[in-house]
Amino acid sequence: MASQKHSRGHGSKQMATASTYDHSRHGYGAHGRHRDSGLLDSLGRFFGGERSVPRKGSGKEVHMSRSGYLSSSPQRSPYHAHGRHVDDNPVVHFFRNIVSPRTPPPSQPKRGFSRFSWGAENHKPYYGGYGSRSLEHHKSSYKGYKDPHREGHGSLSRIFKLGGQRSRSSSPMARR
């Protein structure tokens, strides 16, 4: 009993910290982190509980958390969610929020891919499989925000720098 609780708590901590890292890396800052902390915690509990609880036969806890989660965020989850997709949809929603501000075109293939890979690699290979790729993605933007030597590497800072300098020197009016 104690080990079951321990593993569930550990799993939710891992998920929550990973998710919070993703948010802070994208520069949402304290405002975004505060607002999403409830969502991240529920996501962490979601996956942490999803892994170990149903095996023991106490699925009532999971259903209660599911219904609570669905009612708290009435986006598209209630539409698609009829059992199996419930645990996929928060992930899809989460990745959509992370991926779309930076790179809108690849968000669609990644959305479908993240669904399958996260479902398949939910146990431990998650770090080696999809996690490594997403971390590489985040590292590049993270360096742009934090590292003063590589300020031009983050996509947002690159846009602002290029747009800020070039739009003043060679504006569309000057070209014509």
From Swiss-Prot:
Modified residues (Deamidated asparagine): N97
A single GO cellular-component term on record: compact myelin
UniProt keyword annotations, A-Z: Acetylation, Cell membrane, Citrullination, Membrane, Methylation, Phosphoprotein
Chain positions with N-acetylalanine modification: A2
Basic residues bias: start-end ranges: 1-11
Keyword set includes Cell membrane: yes
Molecular-function annotations in GO: structural constituent of myelin sheath
One Pfam family named in its UniProt record: Myelin_MBP
Residues that bear Citrulline: R25, R33, R176
Compositional bias ranges of the Basic and acidic residues kind: 134-153
Membrane topology: Peripheral membrane protein
Keyword Phosphoprotein listed: yes
Posttranslational mods: As in other animals, several charge isomers may be produced as a result of optional post-translational modifications, such as phosphorylation of serine or threonine residues, deamidation of glutamine or asparagine residues, citrullination and methylation of arginine residues.
Domain of life: Eukaryota
GO BP annotations listed: myelination
Compositional bias (Polar residues): 166-176
Extent of the signal sequence: none
Function: Is, with PLP, the most abundant protein component of the myelin membrane in the CNS. Plays a role in both the formation and stabilization of this compact multilayer arrangement of bilayers. Each splice variant and charge isomer may have a specialized function in the assembly of an optimized, biochemically functional myelin membrane.
Subunit structure: Homodimer.
Protein's name according to its UniProt entry: Myelin basic protein
Protein source organism: Xenopus laevis
Lineage: Eukaryota, Metazoa, Chordata, Craniata, Vertebrata
